[in-house]
Regions:
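Terminal domain-start segments
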Residues: 1-24, 120-124
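Acidic, small-residue rich beta-repeat scaffolds with periodic aromatic anchors
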Residues: 7, 77-136, 153-155, 166, ...
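Acidic/hydrophobic-patterned starts of short beta strands in beta-sheet-rich repeat architectures
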Residues: 29-39, 84-89
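Beta-propeller blade repeat segments, especially FG-GAP/WD-type strand-to-loop junctions
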Residues: 2, 47-68, 110-114
Length: 233
């Protein structure tokens, strides 16, 4: 109760606590304030695993709508809800950080799509420069016909000018993943990318989420992420 739960059966211990960082705002477009809260889970080891949880206001009662794992011992500085999205300002572990001491400044954005809380955007500040992936076309929720092209831009080109991409259905089913090349004047300079998709052979219609990711070559973590949400006909 009171935002905390724990159990100890003599062999195993487990506790979960709602942290004192949260936000109120409309997440589903019904004009009523919902909530975003941060939960920390402790299974008795050294880890402290945090998640962001979307909570709908359903006829005045809180109903958990979706949850996304943030990681072990990340530091959530602030939570905000605007434009039906959850925005987090956090410190995550960089490649050389011990788990106890995160120092990588990130901003993360989450959307509730169907019944899943999706990470839609991540930016990181590395060496004083912000790594961002901006989708320039098409617009979010746009109707597209196979084949369709997604374009984007980055202010700082990734290692070897390579971005990964992942295609998902709104229920979390992964359709495909691969990589693409960024066109730029060299690593660390601004760049652009363009990728054409054709999902007709997979028989996929309806909404799909395509995530473009800059991956750390040091530890495989996400440095930047940009997403396109399109309705495929």
């Amino acid at each position: 109760m009171n935002g905390a739960f724990s159990v100890n059966n003599g062999t195993d211990t487990y506790s979960v606590q709602m942290l004192n960082v949260y936000a109120l705002g409309d997440l589903n477009g019904d004009g009523v304030d919902d909530a975003a809260v941060i939960l920390m889970e402790d299974d008795g080891g050294t880890g402290r695993f945090e998640s962001v949880v979307a909570v709908y206001n359903t006829a005045g009662a809180p109903v958990q709508a979706g949850q996304a794992i943030l990681g072990d011992r990340v530091l959530v500085n602030s939570v905000d809800i605007s434009s039906n999205a959850i925005h987090l300002d956090i410190l995550a572990q960089g490649p050389s950080d011990p788990m106890c001491c995160p120092s990588l400044a990130q901003k993360q954005t989450y959307w509730m799509i169907a019944t899943t809380l999706w990470q839609m955007r991540v930016t990181s500040t590395v060496g004083g420069s912000e790594h961002v992936i901006n989708i320039t076309s098409p617009a979010e929720w746009a109707d597209v016909n196979n084949p369709f092209t997604i374009t984007g831009a980055v202010p700082i080109s990734p290692f070897e000018n390579t971005l990964a991409y992942h295609i998902y259905l709104p229920n979390g089913t992964k359709v495909n993943d691969a990589s693409l090349m960024v066109t730029s004047g060299g690593m660390g300079t601004p760049g652009t990318f363009s990728q054409t998709f054709n999902l007709s052979s997979a028989g996929i219609t309806g909404y799909v989420i395509i995530q473009f990711v800059e991956v750390s070559m040091a530890d495989g973590s996400t440095i930047a992420l940009g997403s396109a949400l399109v309705n495929v006909h």
